């Protein structure tokens, strides 16, 4: 992840039927919640803005990770303590590293503000979670481990 927020995040999935484990660390975050999403395009030519909207191949509304009606890329929030790196530890059953809806080649984005999980009543709640500016992003690639 590069930008005002920086870090390394790993996406692991043992098989198509298993959830994706998302782990890593992000630095440069103010204390509090920060929206954490997979966006549609693996394009950072104009910084994080070129990554497009949240990855949403099923055309659903924005929601919480536990909601049935959510973008595939809606991974909720990560919590920064303000003391050192922010740990990322997410297990998600909707995203995948396999098939047509794979997130490989797309962009993970960290936002400046909390994701209201589609429940904030703001005009952006049902599209972006009103999570604010994109302060860090990186293309999801394949790593040799």
Curated annotation (Swiss-Prot):
It is found in: Cytoplasm. Disulfide bonds join 48-137. Cu cation binds at residues 37, 39, 54, 111. Signal peptide: none annotated. Its main location: cytoplasm. Belongs to the Cu-Zn superoxide dismutase family. Homodimer. Destroys radicals which are normally produced within the cells and which are toxic to biological systems. This is Superoxide dismutase [Cu-Zn].
